[in-house]
Amino acid sequence: MIPTAIPQPLAPTPPPFTERRYVVTFIFVVSLFMLWGLGVTMGDILNKHFQQVLHVSKANSAYVQAATFGAYFVMGLPAGWFMKRFGYQKGVILGLSLYAAGAFLMIPAANAASFGFLLLALFVLACGLGTLEAVAHPFLDGLGDPASSDRRITFSHAINGIGAVSGPLIGGYFVLRGTHAAGDLSSVKTLYSIIGAVVGSIAIAFSFVKVPPLNAEHTPGTATAEGGTSPTPLAADKSLFQHKHFVWACVAQLFNTAAQGGTWAYFINYGTEYVGLSSHTAAYFFSLSLVGMMIGRFLGTYLMQFIAPNKLLAFAALANIGMCLLVAQHWGTVSFVALIGLNFFFSIMFPTIYSLGLKDLGRHKQLASSFIVMGVVGAALFPRFVMGPVANTSVAHAYYLPIICYAVVFLYGAKFYKVQRD
Protein backbone atom coordinates (compact mmCIF):
# COMPACT_ATOMS: atom_id res chain seq x y z
CA MET A 1 0.00 0.00 0.00
CA ILE A 2 1.44 3.34 -1.03
CA PRO A 3 1.35 5.81 1.85
CA THR A 4 -0.55 8.93 1.04
CA ALA A 5 0.95 12.28 1.88
CA ILE A 6 -0.78 14.17 4.62
CA PRO A 7 -1.82 17.54 3.23
CA GLN A 8 -0.19 20.42 5.05
CA PRO A 9 -2.30 23.41 6.00
CA LEU A 10 -1.55 26.51 4.01
CA ALA A 11 0.11 29.35 5.88
CA PRO A 12 -2.43 32.04 6.66
CA THR A 13 -2.31 35.03 4.36
CA PRO A 14 -1.44 38.18 6.30
CA PRO A 15 -4.22 40.75 6.30
CA PRO A 16 -3.80 43.66 3.86
CA PHE A 17 -2.09 46.78 5.16
CA THR A 18 -5.16 48.85 4.28
CA GLU A 19 -7.89 48.82 1.64
CA ARG A 20 -8.04 50.69 -1.66
CA ARG A 21 -11.03 52.76 -0.56
CA TYR A 22 -9.03 54.09 2.41
CA VAL A 23 -5.83 55.08 0.58
CA VAL A 24 -6.50 58.84 0.34
CA THR A 25 -7.73 59.05 3.93
CA PHE A 26 -4.78 56.94 5.10
CA ILE A 27 -2.28 59.30 3.45
CA PHE A 28 -3.85 62.29 5.18
CA VAL A 29 -3.91 60.59 8.59
CA VAL A 30 -0.30 59.40 8.30
CA SER A 31 0.74 62.97 7.44
CA LEU A 32 -0.61 64.00 10.85
CA PHE A 33 2.05 61.89 12.55
CA MET A 34 4.75 63.79 10.67
CA LEU A 35 3.15 67.14 11.52
CA TRP A 36 3.07 66.59 15.26
CA GLY A 37 6.58 65.14 15.24
CA LEU A 38 7.73 68.40 13.66
CA GLY A 39 5.79 70.51 16.16
CA VAL A 40 7.12 68.71 19.24
CA THR A 41 10.84 68.71 18.41
CA MET A 42 10.72 72.33 17.22
CA GLY A 43 10.08 73.27 20.85
CA ASP A 44 13.48 71.96 21.89
CA ILE A 45 15.09 74.42 19.46
CA LEU A 46 13.07 77.28 20.95
CA ASN A 47 14.24 76.26 24.41
CA LYS A 48 17.85 77.23 23.63
CA HIS A 49 16.83 80.22 21.49
CA PHE A 50 14.79 81.78 24.30
CA GLN A 51 17.72 81.33 26.70
CA GLN A 52 19.90 83.41 24.40
CA VAL A 53 17.46 86.03 23.09
CA LEU A 54 15.11 86.51 26.06
CA HIS A 55 17.77 85.75 28.69
CA VAL A 56 15.70 83.18 30.58
CA SER A 57 17.44 80.60 32.77
CA LYS A 58 17.85 76.99 31.72
CA ALA A 59 15.24 75.90 34.25
CA ASN A 60 12.73 78.55 33.16
CA SER A 61 13.30 77.82 29.48
CA ALA A 62 11.89 74.35 30.20
CA TYR A 63 8.49 76.04 30.50
CA VAL A 64 8.52 75.53 26.71
CA GLN A 65 8.18 71.79 27.37
CA ALA A 66 5.69 72.47 30.17
CA ALA A 67 3.46 74.46 27.80
CA THR A 68 3.78 71.91 25.01
CA PHE A 69 3.22 68.71 26.93
CA GLY A 70 0.88 70.26 29.47
CA ALA A 71 -1.46 70.90 26.55
CA TYR A 72 -1.50 67.16 25.84
CA PHE A 73 -2.79 66.58 29.37
CA VAL A 74 -5.41 69.32 29.08
CA MET A 75 -6.70 68.16 25.68
CA GLY A 76 -6.56 64.39 26.21
CA LEU A 77 -10.11 63.85 27.48
CA PRO A 78 -11.79 66.74 25.61
CA ALA A 79 -10.34 65.39 22.36
CA GLY A 80 -11.72 61.94 23.16
CA TRP A 81 -15.18 63.33 23.94
CA PHE A 82 -15.16 65.49 20.80
CA MET A 83 -14.15 62.48 18.71
CA LYS A 84 -16.96 60.35 20.13
CA ARG A 85 -19.53 63.12 19.56
CA PHE A 86 -18.50 64.43 16.12
CA GLY A 87 -16.35 61.68 14.60
CA TYR A 88 -12.73 61.28 13.59
CA GLN A 89 -12.68 63.63 10.60
CA LYS A 90 -13.97 66.63 12.56
CA GLY A 91 -11.56 65.72 15.36
CA VAL A 92 -8.65 65.95 12.91
CA ILE A 93 -9.89 69.30 11.59
CA LEU A 94 -10.16 70.63 15.16
CA GLY A 95 -6.59 69.54 15.89
CA LEU A 96 -5.20 71.09 12.71
CA SER A 97 -7.11 74.33 13.34
CA LEU A 98 -5.65 74.67 16.85
CA TYR A 99 -2.19 73.84 15.48
CA ALA A 100 -2.46 76.60 12.84
CA ALA A 101 -3.95 79.11 15.30
CA GLY A 102 -1.08 78.58 17.73
CA ALA A 103 1.48 78.98 14.94
CA PHE A 104 -0.05 82.28 13.85
CA LEU A 105 -0.21 83.46 17.49
CA MET A 106 3.60 83.16 17.57
CA ILE A 107 3.77 86.25 15.32
CA PRO A 108 2.27 88.81 17.75
CA ALA A 109 3.96 86.99 20.63
CA ALA A 110 7.36 87.42 18.97
CA ASN A 111 6.57 91.07 18.20
CA ALA A 112 5.90 91.61 21.91
CA ALA A 113 9.09 89.69 22.84
CA SER A 114 7.09 88.30 25.75
CA PHE A 115 8.10 84.88 27.06
CA GLY A 116 4.67 84.41 28.62
CA PHE A 117 2.85 85.28 25.38
CA LEU A 118 5.12 82.91 23.44
CA LEU A 119 4.30 80.13 25.91
CA LEU A 120 0.58 80.81 25.46
CA ALA A 121 0.96 80.52 21.67
CA LEU A 122 2.88 77.26 22.06
CA PHE A 123 0.18 75.96 24.42
CA VAL A 124 -2.55 76.61 21.83
CA LEU A 125 -0.42 74.99 19.13
CA ALA A 126 0.21 71.96 21.35
CA CYS A 127 -3.50 71.63 22.12
CA GLY A 128 -3.76 70.92 18.41
CA LEU A 129 -0.93 68.37 18.60
CA GLY A 130 -2.56 66.60 21.54
CA THR A 131 -5.91 66.49 19.74
CA LEU A 132 -4.30 65.03 16.62
CA GLU A 133 -2.50 62.36 18.62
CA ALA A 134 -5.62 61.34 20.54
CA VAL A 135 -7.69 61.08 17.35
CA ALA A 136 -5.17 59.63 14.89
CA HIS A 137 -4.47 56.32 16.65
CA PRO A 138 -8.06 55.00 16.77
CA PHE A 139 -8.70 56.57 13.33
CA LEU A 140 -5.89 54.45 11.88
CA ASP A 141 -7.32 51.40 13.61
CA GLY A 142 -10.47 51.76 11.50
CA LEU A 143 -8.70 52.19 8.15
CA GLY A 144 -8.49 48.50 7.33
CA ASP A 145 -8.50 45.06 8.89
CA PRO A 146 -8.15 45.24 12.71
CA ALA A 147 -5.56 42.43 12.48
CA SER A 148 -3.18 44.75 10.58
CA SER A 149 -3.76 47.85 12.75
CA ASP A 150 -0.45 47.33 14.63
CA ARG A 151 1.43 47.52 11.33
CA ARG A 152 -0.40 50.70 10.32
CA ILE A 153 0.34 52.37 13.67
CA THR A 154 4.00 51.30 13.70
CA PHE A 155 4.49 52.54 10.14
CA SER A 156 2.86 55.85 11.06
CA HIS A 157 5.19 56.26 14.05
CA ALA A 158 8.13 55.75 11.70
CA ILE A 159 6.73 58.59 9.55
CA ASN A 160 6.42 60.58 12.78
CA GLY A 161 10.18 60.14 13.02
CA ILE A 162 10.63 62.02 9.74
CA GLY A 163 8.81 64.99 11.23
CA ALA A 164 10.77 64.69 14.46
CA VAL A 165 14.07 64.74 12.54
CA SER A 166 12.91 67.68 10.42
CA GLY A 167 12.07 69.83 13.46
CA PRO A 168 15.64 70.45 14.65
CA LEU A 169 16.94 70.73 11.07
CA ILE A 170 14.39 73.36 10.10
CA GLY A 171 14.56 75.08 13.47
CA GLY A 172 18.34 75.08 13.44
CA TYR A 173 18.36 76.66 9.98
CA PHE A 174 15.69 79.30 10.59
CA VAL A 175 16.12 80.06 14.29
CA LEU A 176 19.46 79.15 15.87
CA ARG A 177 21.57 80.14 12.87
CA GLY A 178 20.46 83.74 13.27
CA THR A 179 20.53 83.97 17.05
CA HIS A 180 23.76 85.84 17.43
CA ALA A 181 23.43 87.89 14.26
CA ALA A 182 19.91 89.18 14.77
CA GLY A 183 19.43 88.91 18.52
CA ASP A 184 15.66 89.04 18.04
CA LEU A 185 12.68 86.83 17.28
CA SER A 186 12.15 87.67 13.60
CA SER A 187 13.24 84.17 12.54
CA VAL A 188 10.58 82.69 14.85
CA LYS A 189 7.89 84.78 13.13
CA THR A 190 9.02 83.66 9.68
CA LEU A 191 9.15 80.00 10.61
CA TYR A 192 5.78 79.82 12.35
CA SER A 193 3.95 81.86 9.73
CA ILE A 194 5.02 79.21 7.18
CA ILE A 195 3.97 76.39 9.52
CA GLY A 196 0.60 78.03 10.15
CA ALA A 197 -0.08 78.44 6.44
CA VAL A 198 0.86 74.82 5.64
CA VAL A 199 -1.15 73.31 8.50
CA GLY A 200 -4.16 75.52 7.76
CA SER A 201 -4.07 74.44 4.12
CA ILE A 202 -4.03 70.76 5.14
CA ALA A 203 -7.03 71.36 7.42
CA ILE A 204 -8.99 72.91 4.55
CA ALA A 205 -8.00 70.10 2.17
CA PHE A 206 -8.95 67.39 4.66
CA SER A 207 -12.39 68.92 5.16
CA PHE A 208 -13.13 68.05 1.50
CA VAL A 209 -11.99 64.42 1.79
CA LYS A 210 -14.88 61.95 1.69
CA VAL A 211 -14.07 59.39 4.39
CA PRO A 212 -15.53 55.94 3.57
CA PRO A 213 -17.31 53.98 6.32
CA LEU A 214 -14.67 52.66 8.70
CA ASN A 215 -14.16 49.03 9.64
CA ALA A 216 -14.02 50.18 13.26
CA GLU A 217 -17.75 50.86 13.02
CA HIS A 218 -18.23 47.10 13.19
CA THR A 219 -15.89 46.67 16.16
CA PRO A 220 -17.63 46.78 19.55
CA GLY A 221 -17.15 49.95 21.52
CA THR A 222 -15.33 52.03 18.90
CA ALA A 223 -16.19 55.37 17.36
CA THR A 224 -17.75 55.71 13.94
CA ALA A 225 -16.62 58.19 11.31
CA GLU A 226 -19.70 60.30 11.98
CA GLY A 227 -19.49 60.08 15.77
CA GLY A 228 -21.14 57.82 18.32
CA THR A 229 -20.22 54.27 19.30
CA SER A 230 -21.21 50.79 18.33
CA PRO A 231 -22.46 48.17 20.79
CA THR A 232 -20.54 47.25 23.93
CA PRO A 233 -18.82 43.86 24.08
CA LEU A 234 -19.72 41.34 26.73
CA ALA A 235 -16.04 40.77 27.56
CA ALA A 236 -15.41 44.21 29.09
CA ASP A 237 -17.55 44.04 32.23
CA LYS A 238 -14.88 45.59 34.46
CA SER A 239 -14.52 49.34 34.77
CA LEU A 240 -11.54 50.85 32.97
CA PHE A 241 -9.41 51.39 36.07
CA GLN A 242 -9.95 47.81 37.22
CA HIS A 243 -7.67 46.76 34.35
CA LYS A 244 -4.34 46.92 36.17
CA HIS A 245 -2.21 46.56 33.05
CA PHE A 246 -3.86 49.73 31.70
CA VAL A 247 -3.25 51.65 34.94
CA TRP A 248 0.40 50.63 34.89
CA ALA A 249 0.63 51.64 31.23
CA CYS A 250 -0.50 55.15 32.20
CA VAL A 251 2.15 55.25 34.95
CA ALA A 252 4.86 53.90 32.64
CA GLN A 253 3.95 56.39 29.91
CA LEU A 254 4.10 59.25 32.42
CA PHE A 255 7.65 58.31 33.42
CA ASN A 256 8.69 57.45 29.85
CA THR A 257 7.68 60.84 28.48
CA ALA A 258 9.23 62.55 31.52
CA ALA A 259 12.61 61.04 30.67
CA GLN A 260 12.21 61.83 26.98
CA GLY A 261 11.20 65.44 27.59
CA GLY A 262 14.11 66.01 29.96
CA THR A 263 16.62 64.46 27.59
CA TRP A 264 15.46 66.58 24.67
CA ALA A 265 15.16 69.82 26.64
CA TYR A 266 18.85 69.94 27.60
CA PHE A 267 20.40 68.18 24.60
CA ILE A 268 21.64 71.39 22.93
CA ASN A 269 22.89 72.79 26.25
CA TYR A 270 24.90 69.60 26.75
CA GLY A 271 26.46 69.85 23.29
CA THR A 272 27.48 73.48 23.72
CA GLU A 273 28.80 73.16 27.29
CA TYR A 274 30.64 69.82 27.23
CA VAL A 275 31.55 69.23 23.58
CA GLY A 276 32.13 72.84 22.50
CA LEU A 277 29.55 72.84 19.70
CA SER A 278 27.64 75.88 18.50
CA SER A 279 23.89 75.84 19.11
CA HIS A 280 23.36 75.47 15.37
CA THR A 281 25.65 72.42 15.14
CA ALA A 282 24.20 70.85 18.30
CA ALA A 283 20.74 71.10 16.70
CA TYR A 284 21.96 69.01 13.78
CA PHE A 285 23.31 66.37 16.16
CA PHE A 286 19.89 66.38 17.83
CA SER A 287 18.41 65.59 14.42
CA LEU A 288 20.95 62.79 14.02
CA SER A 289 19.78 61.29 17.31
CA LEU A 290 16.20 61.38 16.02
CA VAL A 291 17.30 59.51 12.89
CA GLY A 292 18.49 56.86 15.33
CA MET A 293 15.04 56.85 16.91
CA MET A 294 13.40 56.34 13.52
CA ILE A 295 15.79 53.47 12.70
CA GLY A 296 15.06 51.97 16.11
CA ARG A 297 11.34 51.89 15.33
CA PHE A 298 11.85 50.03 12.08
CA LEU A 299 14.28 47.62 13.74
CA GLY A 300 11.97 47.14 16.71
CA THR A 301 9.06 46.35 14.41
CA TYR A 302 11.14 43.63 12.77
CA LEU A 303 12.43 42.18 16.06
CA MET A 304 8.93 41.95 17.51
CA GLN A 305 8.32 39.06 15.13
CA PHE A 306 10.77 37.04 17.24
CA ILE A 307 10.94 38.75 20.64
CA ALA A 308 7.98 39.64 22.84
CA PRO A 309 7.37 43.43 22.82
CA ASN A 310 7.45 43.64 26.63
CA LYS A 311 10.93 42.05 26.65
CA LEU A 312 12.22 44.55 24.10
CA LEU A 313 10.73 47.34 26.21
CA ALA A 314 12.48 46.11 29.36
CA PHE A 315 15.80 45.76 27.50
CA ALA A 316 15.52 49.28 26.04
CA ALA A 317 14.87 50.70 29.52
CA LEU A 318 17.95 48.96 30.93
CA ALA A 319 20.04 50.20 28.00
CA ASN A 320 18.99 53.79 28.64
CA ILE A 321 19.86 53.49 32.33
CA GLY A 322 23.39 52.68 31.19
CA MET A 323 23.37 55.53 28.67
CA CYS A 324 22.28 58.04 31.33
CA LEU A 325 25.11 56.94 33.61
CA LEU A 326 27.58 57.64 30.79
CA VAL A 327 26.03 61.01 29.94
CA ALA A 328 26.19 62.14 33.57
CA GLN A 329 29.98 61.59 33.66
CA HIS A 330 30.50 64.32 30.98
CA TRP A 331 33.39 62.42 29.39
CA GLY A 332 33.40 64.55 26.26
CA THR A 333 32.68 62.72 23.01
CA VAL A 334 31.96 59.38 24.72
CA SER A 335 29.19 60.87 26.85
CA PHE A 336 27.80 62.86 23.93
CA VAL A 337 27.56 59.70 21.82
CA ALA A 338 25.65 58.10 24.71
CA LEU A 339 23.32 61.10 24.73
CA ILE A 340 22.68 60.61 21.01
CA GLY A 341 22.12 56.90 21.64
CA LEU A 342 19.33 57.53 24.15
CA ASN A 343 16.90 58.26 21.32
CA PHE A 344 17.63 54.92 19.64
CA PHE A 345 16.28 53.09 22.68
CA PHE A 346 13.47 55.62 23.17
CA SER A 347 12.17 54.52 19.78
CA ILE A 348 9.95 51.61 20.75
CA MET A 349 8.94 52.83 24.20
CA PHE A 350 5.95 55.07 23.51
CA PRO A 351 4.18 52.85 20.93
CA THR A 352 4.94 49.65 22.87
CA ILE A 353 3.61 50.98 26.18
CA TYR A 354 0.62 52.33 24.27
CA SER A 355 -0.22 49.02 22.57
CA LEU A 356 0.36 46.87 25.68
CA GLY A 357 -1.86 49.16 27.73
CA LEU A 358 -4.78 48.90 25.29
CA LYS A 359 -4.92 45.10 25.16
CA ASP A 360 -8.27 43.46 25.88
CA LEU A 361 -10.05 46.65 26.96
CA GLY A 362 -13.08 46.21 24.70
CA ARG A 363 -15.51 49.12 25.03
CA HIS A 364 -12.99 51.07 27.14
CA LYS A 365 -10.32 51.26 24.43
CA GLN A 366 -11.22 54.73 23.16
CA LEU A 367 -11.25 56.39 26.58
CA ALA A 368 -8.12 54.47 27.58
CA SER A 369 -6.34 55.91 24.54
CA SER A 370 -7.02 59.44 25.81
CA PHE A 371 -5.71 58.62 29.29
CA ILE A 372 -2.48 57.11 27.96
CA VAL A 373 -1.92 60.16 25.74
CA MET A 374 -2.43 62.34 28.84
CA GLY A 375 0.65 60.64 30.31
CA VAL A 376 2.67 62.97 28.10
CA VAL A 377 2.25 65.51 30.92
CA GLY A 378 5.38 63.89 32.37
CA ALA A 379 7.37 65.72 29.70
CA ALA A 380 5.77 68.98 30.87
CA LEU A 381 6.74 68.61 34.52
CA PHE A 382 10.03 66.73 34.59
CA PRO A 383 12.32 69.05 32.56
CA ARG A 384 11.32 72.19 34.47
CA PHE A 385 10.65 71.04 38.01
CA VAL A 386 12.91 68.00 38.41
CA MET A 387 15.83 68.30 35.98
CA GLY A 388 15.75 72.11 35.69
CA PRO A 389 17.07 73.04 39.17
CA VAL A 390 19.92 70.53 38.79
CA ALA A 391 20.67 71.65 35.21
CA ASN A 392 21.14 75.23 36.41
CA THR A 393 24.19 73.93 38.27
CA SER A 394 25.24 70.97 36.09
CA VAL A 395 23.48 69.83 32.93
CA ALA A 396 25.44 66.56 33.01
CA HIS A 397 24.40 65.65 36.56
CA ALA A 398 20.76 66.33 35.67
CA TYR A 399 20.92 63.20 33.51
CA TYR A 400 21.10 61.01 36.62
CA LEU A 401 17.43 61.79 37.24
CA PRO A 402 15.88 60.01 34.19
CA ILE A 403 17.32 56.75 35.57
CA ILE A 404 14.37 56.67 37.99
CA CYS A 405 12.00 56.94 35.03
CA TYR A 406 13.64 54.10 33.14
CA ALA A 407 13.45 51.90 36.22
CA VAL A 408 9.66 52.32 36.19
CA VAL A 409 9.49 51.53 32.46
CA PHE A 410 11.62 48.43 33.06
CA LEU A 411 9.24 47.20 35.77
CA TYR A 412 6.30 47.66 33.43
CA GLY A 413 7.97 45.68 30.65
CA ALA A 414 9.20 42.97 33.01
CA LYS A 415 6.08 42.44 35.13
CA PHE A 416 3.18 44.88 35.13
CA TYR A 417 2.26 44.63 31.42
CA LYS A 418 0.36 41.38 32.00
CA VAL A 419 -3.39 41.31 31.39
CA GLN A 420 -5.17 39.85 34.39
CA ARG A 421 -8.04 37.61 33.38
CA ASP A 422 -10.41 37.34 36.34
Where are these regions (language model features)?
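Intracellular juxtamembrane helix-capping segments at the cytosolic ends
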Residues: 131-145, 347-362
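C-terminal ends and interior cores of transmembrane alpha-helices
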Residues: 97-112, 318-331
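Central cavity-lining transmembrane alpha-helices of secondary-active solute carriers
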Residues: 63-81, 287-299, 378
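Helix-to-loop junctions at the C-terminal end of transmembrane segments
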Residues: 75-88, 175, 296-308, 390
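Extracytoplasmic
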Residues: 24-54, 136-137, 167, 263-271
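Extracytoplasmic gate region of multi-pass secondary transporters
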Residues: 43-47, 168, 238-287
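Cytosolic juxtamembrane N-terminal segment immediately preceding the first transmembrane helix
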Residues: 1-36, 52, 238
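Helix-loop-helix hairpin linking two adjacent transmembrane segments in secondary transporters
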Residues: 146-211
